[in-house]
Amino acid sequence: EGPRTFMGFSVSDYPNMFMVIGPGSVGVLANYPPHIEMQVAWIADFLEYLSANGNTRAEVDADAQDQWCAEVEAAAVGTMFNAPNCHSWYNGGNIEGKSRVIPIYMGGLDRFMARARDLAANDYEGFSIH
């Protein structure tokens, strides 16, 4: 099936696990320092939100994760990385039998950051919070 995350931050069925520069983030297509800083700040803000609201557990919903993965795939349409004759680690085509999945969000860091801000502004919709 390939790597599946929600914005490279979180994975369904793994509550309270957060990461930076994971699959589904802008990753290697962005300047790492601002991308890492943005993701660390987002995760820290989310943890503060959880604590301020008396919550101790957060897990991304599988539906939200699936929607994000579809958005990652859609952002790659028309790029060389998604071309049928591209056999690269970018899409899993370098290993026969491996799932062809684009693990990098190609919509750009600005759009990625705007999406993350919107998520926070909407009380982290897409996460089950307890």
Model-derived segments and spans:
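Central helical "cap/lid" subdomain
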Residues: E1-G8
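C-terminal, flexible cofactor-proximal segment of oxidoreductases
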Residues: T5, F18-H130
